[in-house]
Amino acid sequence: MYRPDLLAFLLPLLAAPVFSAETLDCGKIRADGHTFDLSKLGGPHSVVTTRYKPNPAGHYNTTYTLDVCKPLKKSGGSKSECPNGTRVCAITHLLKSDGDKKEEDEVTDIVAIAGNLENAGGSRFEWTPTRLSTAESDSDKKKEGLRLVLTGGKDPLSGPSKEKTDQKAIIEFLCDPNKEGTEGEWVSEEKYEKRADEKKDDDKKEDGGDKDEGESTLEHQLKHENASLIWDGFEVEKDVGILRLTWHTKYACEKRDESGGGGSDDGGDNSSSHWGFFTWFVLIAFLLIAGYLIFSSWINFTRYGARGWDLLPHSDTIRDIPYLLKDFIRRILNTVQGTGSRGGYSAV
């Protein structure tokens, strides 16, 4: 028969690998004894996919935007956006043109995939990190990096609960020592507030290197040749909408390099992660002395039935230590102070 209070204690432990929004620090993502620093990848980053539908004719472009460090914040006042607290958002545009008329842009779908969306019709934001090199899957063990699962979204956010589909994003950060992680990013229609250093590179990303696969009815990514952020798919699996992304970056490398990539084992700095020789010497000496005292006390108790101070080895010497120290200190004081100015003779 089990105790209810014991069950209440064990249930939180079973969910230990899942973390809440308050504990997400992109600069210190700990997974299986290793700490990854993804703070340099903070800010909004987007991938854009396209799909052509012949009837009615038009291109459906979907912009998937994420921020691994904090919720997305729109720079404008457009209503076509995910609610506050969203970290991963998908917005679909229908692009169509009628002959010589101007091309029309219509927002057809908005999906909040992950974020703290309890107040918007979704659920609580949770994230699960997995260190690929020590994962259970054989295919993952061949990789170096981090898998991050982000949850909290539902589609649609409004309406009866039974009509809502849970959403989540699975992002694999793979080690690439030659990539910062911001290369080849496609400029999307959605405008989010960026970090100052990202705004300086916007003009460089708008020219050259485009890769479009033409009038395809299958959803595919619009990307440059050197793209670091790759879209792998967005499909419903077991009643859950799952967005899969792969992010090639040096910040997923486990070995720290001179340019700041990688993380650290045990969540500590290299200078404090190893003990020095003196520390080990003191520790071993303490253990040896403690072991000697315990073993000798046990011998004295079992063989001679000793009690109290008699249990300790050399108990007579130990008892005399205070008196020996007192006599030793007295001799030192007499030597330092001397016998006065009588030339070594005492008064009669």
UniProtKB/Swiss-Prot annotation:
This is Autophagy-related protein 27. It is found in: Cytoplasmic vesicle membrane; Golgi apparatus membrane; Mitochondrion membrane; Preautophagosomal structure membrane. The gene is ATG27. GO terms for cellular component: cytoplasmic vesicle membrane; Golgi membrane; mitochondrial membrane; phagophore assembly site membrane. Residues 296-348 are cytoplasmic. SUPFAM superfamilies: Mannose 6-phosphate receptor domain (SSF50911). Its main location: membrane. It comes from Gibberella zeae (strain ATCC MYA-4620 / CBS 123657 / FGSC 9075 / NRRL 31084 / PH-1). Disulfide bonds join 26-69, 82-89, 175-253. InterPro entries: Autophagy-rel_prot_27 (IPR018939), Man6P_isomerase_rcpt-bd_dom_sf (IPR009011), MRH_dom (IPR044865).
